[in-house]
Structures are given as C-alpha cells and as structure tokens.
UniProtKB/Swiss-Prot annotation:
The reaction(s) this protein catalyses: tRNA(Ser) + L-serine + ATP = L-seryl-tRNA(Ser) + AMP + diphosphate + H(+); tRNA(Sec) + L-serine + ATP = L-seryl-tRNA(Sec) + AMP + diphosphate + H(+)
Pfam families linked to this entry: Seryl_tRNA_N, tRNA-synt_2b
Binding sites annotated in the UniProt record for L-serine: 229-231, 283, 383
Main location: cytoplasm
Membrane-spanning residues: none
Pathway, per record: Aminoacyl-tRNA biosynthesis; selenocysteinyl-tRNA(Sec) biosynthesis; L-seryl-tRNA(Sec) from L-serine and tRNA(Sec): step 1/1
Protein name in UniProt: Serine--tRNA ligase
A GO CC term attached to the entry: cytoplasm
EC number(s) given by UniProt: 6.1.1.11
Xref: PROSITE patterns: AA_TRNA_LIGASE_II
Organismal lineage: Bacteria, Pseudomonadati, Pseudomonadota, Alphaproteobacteria, Acetobacterales
Family as reported in the entry's similarity comment: Belongs to the class-II aminoacyl-tRNA synthetase family. Type-1 seryl-tRNA synthetase subfamily.
C-alpha cells in the first residue's frame, strides 16, 4: 500500500515511479478522490459539531419553556446530512483503497531499467561449473532411471505438475530441508517457526498476494487460502502489532509445503519438478526498523547464498530489473543455480525487500526507542531455498556417468552417511 501523503506531496514523482513498471499514471485521479474525501470529512465534522451544540440549545429552550420547533427541524436535517456524509466518506475510502491496492510497490532507485528478465544484471557468480566427461542428463531422466521419481503415479493421484519421490530421493529432499533449517537457525540467527498452510484472506492481502494474484493461488470453499509461500503466515504474524524497537530485527524461518496454481504457465517446464502445484520451501522473513532494511536485505541474500556454497552448487546473483521485479518488492535479488542437464541458469531463490509496502497493508508498526510515535516496520522475505529446485540442482551437478548421484558432504549426516544414490 502506498502513502497518500507522499502521493499528495509529489504526484509527478509518484506517476514516474509507476511508469518505471509500465503502469499508467494514477496520481491525479487518486489525489482528486482524496480531496473529495477530505472535504467530506471536514463537512461531516462540522455537521457533527453543529449537532452537538444544537442539542444543548434545544435543551436550554425546553428548560425555559420556549419554542424549539425550528431547532428540532434543523436537528432532523442534520441527522440526514450526517448519515449521507458518513456513507460518502465510506464510499470514497473504499474507492481510494481499491485504487491503491492494485498499484505495485515503488522501486528502489538502484533497480536497473528494463522490461523483462533479459535486462537483469549479474551481480556476481560463484563456483566453477563442472566439466562432464559425458552428456549430463536432466533431473527427471536421472530420477526416473533410478526408479525414485514417479510422475506417472503422481498424475494418477493428482494430475499434472505433481511428483512422487521414493527411497533415497525422498530422503534427500527431507535432508535438504533439515540442512537448510539448521544452517539458518544455528548459524544465521533465525527463529524456526512452524506455520499453518491455510490462512485467511487478511493474511493474503497484507502480504500483497491479494487481489493481484488470486488466480495463482488455491482457495478453499470456506474462504481460506493455501499458502503460496511461508512468507504469508510469517510476515502476517505481526499484522496489527506495535513492536518495541528492542524486538527488531525479528528473523523467522519456516519449512513448509507451498501451493501455486501456476496460472499462465501453460507450456513452461512441463516435464520434471521445476514448476509444480505443490512443493517444499524454506522461507526466511525479517521484520526491521526502516533504517536497517537495506543491510538486512544483503544479509538475507548472503544467508541464502551460504546454502548453495555449502552444497557446492555453482550460482549467480541477479539484480532484477524494473520489469521483472515482483509486485510487492522494492528491490529483489534472485539466485540462479547452474543446471548442467538443462545447460542453463535457473532461479532457486528470490530475496526481496518490500520496505513499508506490506506493513501499510497490514498495519504493522514499531515504537522507536526515542519514544516517538509508532512507525511502519519494513518487511523482507527470501527463499532459503526452494527445496525441490535444490534437489534438482544437486542431482544434475552431482550425477555420474552410470546414473548414480553422489551425495554432497553437507547432506551425508542427514542421510546416515550415504555417499551415493544408485539404482534400486
């Protein structure tokens, strides 16, 4: 949600920020609605004040036995006027809100211009890509040959974009999630949190998933939503709160199932585990004071990078351009892992700062240490990492000519010392 005061102060700058994302100008229309609302509020307050004084005047006349008919008639008219003005204020409030909630966050000045992912900027690249002595295979070919990755049974059970993992691959997926959680909790200072996968509409709205992405999420018949990411319950846990400055930064991490309808993804990544309706993901969320959020964004991204470094997966950090930055983000770093089977870099983590965009939607604030009035917090979120995609990266980077997969050293303590996954 945007700050109306900032819009009123500089409507041209507001529209320029929208233009960076390819959005049409909106400031003049919203400012006009806001002027109408403020005028209606002033008129309402004047009428309410007059009603209060009128009540005293009528009472005084009645006590002296004088005629109060004219004043009583005025009171009737005032009541009608107040009711109409109250309706008008509510309608204008709703109209302004409807305009604001569909507008994306204002981008950081350092976000590069560009319409799509082709304009994203490589910040750095880490790790050497392995030189294979054989043609590397994609993860689904490896998994099916091992007899441990079953898309046919998943299709029978649930349809397309699901998978059944068995044996050592299922164990490796579990090991990856546990390894990531342990790293973030024990070394990075996050608090492990177990969250519901069903949330209410307010939680989805507050984390900017509604109304914009309603068609990309699953809604239950009773009006609740399956979470597309644990960012939703973690971030929404501070909705409506006023946190003490001493409680910041608040760092939380969760491993959860995530659910996405993948609307608009027809024909993309139809084979394998890259794009699924249900998947596991470790999510990091930080709640900070405004002055600390940029440093926290870098810190969070480094926490995600550490996972890839411990696993020995080559990766690169990308700064997303204006046209590729998500709706609620002010700035986003994507981490892309090298997948030799695809001969391509693929996103495995996305770390974003939303500044106060989500906080305004959910009224999440903190009280500064100097005793000043409450201010909106800043919220950040990042994948630490997507477990299924990390499994893909491990399989493709650690595959052997005979189709077996070497288990990375970092995962062996979680797999009872298993050194390699071979065909059953």
């Amino acid at each position: 949600m945007h700050d109306l005061r900032a819009l009123r102060a500089d409507p041209a700058a507001f529209d320029a920020a929208l233009a960076r994302r390819g959005e049409a100008p909106a400031a003049i229309h919203i400012a006009s609605l806001d002027e109408d609302r403020r005028a209606a509020v002033t008129a309402l307050q004047d009428k309410q004040a007059r009603r209060k004084s009128l009540s005293k005047e009528v009472g005084a006349l009645r006590r002296t036995g004088e005629d109060s008919t004219a004043l009583e008639a005025e009171a009737v008219q005032l009541r009608e006027d107040i009711e109409k003005l109250e309706v008008l204020v509510r309608e204008l409030d709703a109209e302004i809100r409807d305009c604001l909630v569909v507008l994306p966050n204002r981008l950081d000045d350092g976000v590069p211009e560009g319409a799509d992912e082709s304009a994203n900027v490589v910040v750095h690249q880490v790790g050497e890509r392995r030189d294979f002595a054989f043609p590397p295979r994609e993860h689904f070919a490896l998994g099916e040959a091992l007899g441990l990755m079953d898309f046919e049974t998943a299709g029978k059970l649930s349809g397309a974009r699901f998978v059944v993992l068995r044996g050592a691959l299922a164990r490796m997926e579990r090991a990856l999630g546990q390894f990531m959680l342990d790293l973030h909790v024990q070394e990075h200072g996050y608090t492990e949190t177990a969250v519901p996968v069903l949330v209410n509409e307010a939680a989805m709205f507050g984390t900017d998933k509604l109304p914009k992405f309603a068609d990309q999420s699953f809604r239950t018949e009773d009006g609740r939503w399956l979470i597309p990411t644990a960012e939703v319950p973690l971030t929404a846990s501070v909705a409506g709160d006023i946190l003490p400055a001493s409680a910041l930064p608040r760092r939380m991490v969760a491993l959860s199932s995530c659910f996405r309808s993948e609307a608009g993804a027809a024909g993309r990544d139809t084979r394998g585990m890259l794009r699924q309706h249900q998947f596991q993901k470790v999510e990091m969320v930080s709640i900070t004071a405004p002055g600390d959020s940029d440093a926290e964004h870098e810190r969070m991204t480094r926490c995600a990078e550490k996972v890839l470094e411990r696993l020995g997966i080559p990766y690169r950090r990308m700064l997303l351009c204006a046209g590729d930055t998500g709706f609620g983000a002010a700035r986003t770093f994507d981490l892309e892992a090298w997948l030799p089977g695809q001969d391509a870099w693929r996103e495995i983590s996305s770390c974003s700062t939303t500044r106060d965009f989500q906080a305004r939607r959910m009224n999440a604030r903190y009280r500064p240490a100097d005793g000043a009035g409450p201010e909106f917090v800043h919220t950040l979120n990042g994948s630490g990492l997507a477990v299924g995609r990390t499994l893909i990266a491990v399989m493709e980077n650690y595959q052997n000519a005979d189709g077996s997969i070497t288990v990375p050293q970092a995962l062996r303590p979680y797999m009872n010392g298993l050194a390699a996954i071979s065909a059953r």
